[in-house]
Amino acid sequence: DPKTTLTGDFTFEQIPVDAWRGNFDLNLVGGVLLPCQEFCPAMLQSGRGSVINIASVSAHIPLSRVIAYSAAKAAVLSLSQFLAREWAAAGVRVNTITPGFFPAEQNRKILFHEDGSPTARTESIMGHTPMGRFGEADELIGAAVFLASHQASSFVTGSDIRVDGGFLSQTI
């Protein structure tokens, strides 16, 4: 389904418009815009709240073959920074978490062969990740708990917490 395609054997010129729309609908409209419009008025009225949006390392460094996804995630970062400035005076904090590479069902086919051995892409990712491994769900949860805690992060807004094993510290 081109609307949910995150990767593919397309050059930039070949990426279907539906893939662009699908990525922006899923990641920006469905993942940030609509939830913020639905839930943030109550936070703004109460004078307190924390919005945590999910970006991607590919928002910072657009990766080959996933440019529609990269652009949508870069838009998540941009909108989150705007909302952080817009809502800070009302007491609502807006931050992002940028995950590195976490094995998930949606990317298993590009990371591992059917026999479970790593693909060339996995070996490349690990070679560019100083910690030399994939992330684990608990590591993302820890960042989210920190950002959600008023006590721990009441002065944190407009920030991007990178949970990427150092991936973005490397030059690709």
Predicted ranges, named:
Residues 6-33, 52, 76, 131:
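Catalytic Tyr-X3-Lys loop
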Residues 10, 89, 101-128, 170-172:
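A glycine/serine/threonine-rich, flexible loop-to-helix segment
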Residues 36, 72, 80:
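Active-site helix of classical SDR
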Residues 41, 85-89, 154:
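Alpha-helical segment proximal to the catalytic Tyr-Lys
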Residues 56:
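Residue(s) in the substrate-gating loop at a strand-loop-helix junction
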Residues 61, 131, 145, 151-172:
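Short C-terminal tail/terminal secondary-structure segment
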Residues 62-70, 82, 110:
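Active-site loop-to-helix junction immediately N-terminal to the catalytic Tyr of the SDR YXXXK motif
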Residues 116-117, 129-140:
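A conserved structural motif in NAD(P)-dependent oxidoreductases
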